[in-house]
C-alpha cells in the first residue's frame, strides 16, 4: 500500500536538463552502519551532480562488514570517488578538464582518514582497494568537504526518510514536476 502511494505521488517527477547547463561537478556520499539486519553490512549511497542536476547515483550494499561509522563512510566515499573519476574521464573526451571536484561527506572521521597518508592501527583492517581515494585527494582530483547531515543529499540512497527530508532532497537533486515544465514550454 505504501509503495503504491509513493508511486502515485511521484509519477510526474523527473530530471530536467536545460540547454544552458554548466559543467560544475559535485558529489555526495553517505552510508548507514550495519543497515542489513541479516549480515550487518552497511549500504553505500552516492550521487554526482552536474551543475546541480543529478547525472549519476548509486546505492549498494558494502562487501565487507564495517566496524565503525567512519569505516562505512570511508568505503562509501571511495565508491563515490570511482564514479567521479569516471565522470572526469568522460568529460576529458570533450576537452573539459576538471580538478578538485568537491565530494561532500557527513563524517569528520572519514574525512580525516582520507587526508591522512599514514595507516594507523585503527584503519589497517580496511581493504586496500578503498585507499585509492587518498591518492585522488593528494593528486587534487577531488576535495573532500564536510556537509551537515541535514544537508546530505545522499541520504536518500541509504535510509528511509520522513516526507520533509524526502521533498528537500528531491529538490536538491534537481528533481521537478515535469508536467509543469512541459506546460510552460508549450505555452511559450
Q: Where are the regions that the model predicts?
A:
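Alpha-helical scaffold segments in carbohydrate-active enzymes
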Residues: 2-9, 86, 109
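Structured nucleic-acid-interacting core domains from mobile-element enzymes and related host factors
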Residues: 5-29, 96
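Intrinsically disordered, low-complexity boundary segments flanking structured domains
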Residues: 1-2, 14-15, 129-134
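Acidic, metal-ligating active-site segments
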Residues: 29-52
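RNase H-like nuclease module associated with reverse transcription
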Residues: 23-24, 42, 49, 54, ...
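Glycine-rich, charged/polar anion/phosphate-binding loops
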Residues: 12, 32-35, 89
Amino acid at each position: 500500500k505504501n509503495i503504491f502511494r509513493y508511486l502515485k505521488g511521484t509519477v510526474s517527477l523527473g530530471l530536467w536538463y536545460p540547454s544552458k547547463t554548466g559543467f560544475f561537478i559535485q558529489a555526495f556520499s553517505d552510508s548507514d552502519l550495519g543497515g542489513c539486519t541479516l549480515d550487518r553490512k552497511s549500504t553505500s549511497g552516492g550521487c554526482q551532480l552536474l551543475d546541480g542536476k543529478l547525472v549519476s547515483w548509486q546505492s549498494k550494499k558494502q562487501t565487507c562488514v564495517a566496524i565503525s561509522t567512519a569505516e562505512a563512510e570511508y568505503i562509501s566515499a571511495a565508491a563515490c570517488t570511482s564514479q567521479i573519476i569516471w565522470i572526469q574521464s568522460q568529460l576529458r573526451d570533450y576537452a573539459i578538464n576538471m580538478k578538485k571536484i568537491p565530494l561532500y561527506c557527513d563524517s569528520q572521521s572519514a574525512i580525516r582518514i582520507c587526508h591522512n597518508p599514514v595507516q594507523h592501527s585503527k584503519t589497517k583492517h580496511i581493504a586496500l582497494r578503498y585507499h585509492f581515494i587518498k591518492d585522488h585527494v593528494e593528486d587534487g582530483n577531488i576535495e573532500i568537504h564536510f556537509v551537515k547531515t541535514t544537508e546530505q543529499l545522499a541520504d536518500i540512497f541509504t535510509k528511509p526518510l520522513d516526507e520533509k527530508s524526502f521533498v528537500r532532497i528531491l529538490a536538491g537533486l534537481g528533481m521537478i514536476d515535469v508536467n509543469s515544465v512541459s506546460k510552460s514550454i508549450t505555452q511559450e
